């Protein structure tokens, strides 16, 4: 009797254990798709779900092979490598995951390759970039203004830190406006999926929302306030049809605090720190630049959380680095974008920047990536620019950096805080770069005050600042609204809605008939200088030669073997006469300096071996040379 009861008890316990063990479940697969004949092969999948302990994965088609399985301690993440035959055709290639408790299917696709002749075009000095914050540019689809789960207070145009309704469709609707302005590339701030709620914190910027896109909760998702993946693909297709390129803003450095990883990280060292215990980034870029800084002083800037609330990714963990590199390439291959702007690049390990750059260029030879190393010191920016190894032996191989140092000086010059000669003084630091022509120059930026709202900012100053930026070396970048001298103080006031992009706007600056007098003056000026740059290759790619400079004016040339264009800028409130030796440009006696149609000025003569310049007050002019 006792033996029978014992047997029954054992059977009961076994049944309970069997009932408690559950079959694996799949929540997300990253990346969800890949390509045959890709330079990354095998591709490393990260599968999120539950009950993966003891799992094995079985391909359902012979064109793919699976290896290197790794399950985290919580059995909620599964890493696996998928090798794809170069002969595999596009289609569905599901994988079976099997444990002793059951099976589940991992969805996976092989996608067709996009045409490389019309996609992945890269960016260079022939381009003019236009920065757009989708939420603040134009509302083209009212149906996504308040997505499911987004509270009313998160969607309010009266609140500068809430979602305003701008979206990808709004950008698509105004591509012809951008083409007519003359820009050639659009950079959109991140379209990653972000949390739809209202964020509360102890910082001055809370409560807020993540309308800006820099706090991803899904690296492979599109923010539902902005649209869908198909909307992004359509944007790229339509832009390419109009001769416009598209740049994606990527953020490998950090994610949002609402990312599912925060409560269940794939690996213990996926992040630097935890929500309860982490370092706040002190933004000590000087510690990164100096070879004499201690590792203890350097680590907080590399490992610290951005703004104390955006978890810092640990690219020194190989799985993290692989994940982020694949994510960058997936977006390029999936959408056909032409460039990447990499956020806060200086806070990531330099070897990771190098590996990311190499991976991009191996697969997409024309691909271009610009990094944000926000610092007023040219030595700091040059340290992150590709082309030369730093003190650590690492060449980041980064295509471009934003020229924040020159931008800050230009703003100070044209708001009368520094003498005009400061422009030339800053440009001498071009010697720090292997090739300063690869820098990306700025007219405006979404993290700073707009020019017209600076202390000392005026419409005429904004015009001179823009003329300088469009004619100096590098690839220029405008911020939406710069072309109409939009005002804007500190964040978030510098992210006002573009007038005319939203229902109920009092005027429409997308149309000449809808602009104010000030807006039209700035728009016409911007369009003319853009056209001048596009009409003359020498302005885009020629050598930069100093001719004359003092506290009030700067005259310089862009020259190549076939053409020379002279730019003369006078900040003074009074007309100014300047001379310079004709030998600076090897001009013979009698050569004529002819004002370009842009300004309509009369002919100037070279006499007595001197170039004679009569510069009107507060002016920027361009001259061509007739020998």
Segments predicted by a language model, with ranges:
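Carbohydrate-interacting/catalytic domains
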Residues: 91, 104, 109-128, 179-182, ...
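Beta-strand/beta-sandwich contexts
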Residues: 21-54, 106-120
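Bacterial N-terminal signal peptides
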Residues: 2-14
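Active-site clefts of carbohydrate-active enzymes
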Residues: 436-457
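Structural recognition of the beta-strand scaffold that forms the well-ordered cores
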Residues: 129-133, 185-190, 218, 245-248, ...
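Substrate-binding/active-site clefts of carbohydrate-active enzymes
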Residues: 127, 137-335, 355-362, 368, ...
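Immunoglobulin-like IPT/TIG beta-sandwich domains and homologous Ig-like subdomains
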Residues: 38-101
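Active-site-proximal helices and loops of the catalytic beta/alpha 8
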Residues: 236, 254, 327-329, 333-434, ...
